[in-house]
From Swiss-Prot:
NCBIfam families: rsmG_gidB (TIGR00138)
Biological source species: Caulobacter vibrioides (strain NA1000 / CB15N)
Name listed for the protein in its UniProt record: Ribosomal RNA small subunit methyltransferase G
UniProt keyword annotations, A-Z: Cytoplasm, Methyltransferase, rRNA processing, S-adenosyl-L-methionine, Transferase
EC number of the protein: 2.1.1.170
Length: 216
């Protein structure tokens, strides 16, 4: 999968299209399909994702999450902040399963969403650790910290500060208003950032963040 290759806005993948684009194995597709089923079932009793997005799962959720791995191909330790729906964390764990030393920390403050993550992790035998905690209260040593639909950049950087200060690089999935969010965030934070176009939606962006510190 090429990091800068984006789909057309109207493109919708199925499992075969996702597999061809990402290079996923048959076993990974089986796990991702099972995750789609669990996500749909649990979404009926708790608000995990927009219900209409289940139909576009392979693009909106699977590809949106999977596109992060080529941006950090050597990373084995990941933290997903606000991981309640398992996106991107569960998808990353499925694709990293079997890699030596791989672990994805799923950080979620809502206990009922942690229960969902526990069911998924057990069902799919994933290399994850689930933390029922506030992201900013943990001190985890990871290579990459990520989040999707978690908070505006100013607040998100506050959540991610302990990880970024401990050597992690941030890879955050954001929407088309990210440049406004970044401008606002620079009033409170100093950091290096790089934007990439999302492969799953050319209107979306992936924000890479390094060297974070508070504005003095």
């Amino acid at each position: 999968m090429q990091p800068d290759l984006a789909l057309a806005p109207e493109a919708v993948l199925d499992a075969a299209g996702f597999q061809a684009l990402v290079g996923a194995t048959d076993a990974q597709i089986e796990d991702l399909t099972r995750f789609q089923t669990l996500l749909a079932e649990w979404n009926e009793v708790m608000n995990l994702v927009g219900p209409l997005t289940i139909a576009t799962y392979w693009t909106r959720h699977a590809l949106d999450s999977a596109q992060l791995i080529p941006l950090a191909p050597e990373a084995t330790a990941w933290a997903d902040l606000g991981a309640g729906a398992g996106l991107p964390g569960v998808v990353l764990a499925i694709l990293l399963k079997g890699r030596a030393g791989a672990k994805v920390h799923l950080v979620e403050s809502m206990i009922k969403r942690c229960r969902f993550l526990e069911v998924v992790a057990k069902d799919l035998d994933l290399p994850v650790q689930i933390h029922n905690a506030r992201a900013e209260d943990l001190k985890l040593k990871v290579d990459i910290v990520t989040a999707r639909a978690c908070a505006p950049m100013t607040k998100l950087l506050g959540f991610a500060e302990p990880y970024l200060r401990n050597g992690a690089v941030g890879l955050f999935l954001k929407g088309q208003d990210v440049e406004t969010e970044l401008s606002e965030a620079r009033k409170a934070w100093t950091f290096e950032s790089e934007l990439r176009t999302s492969q799953s939606d050319p209107r979306g962006r992936i924000v890479q963040v390094k060297r974070l510190s508070r504005v003095r």
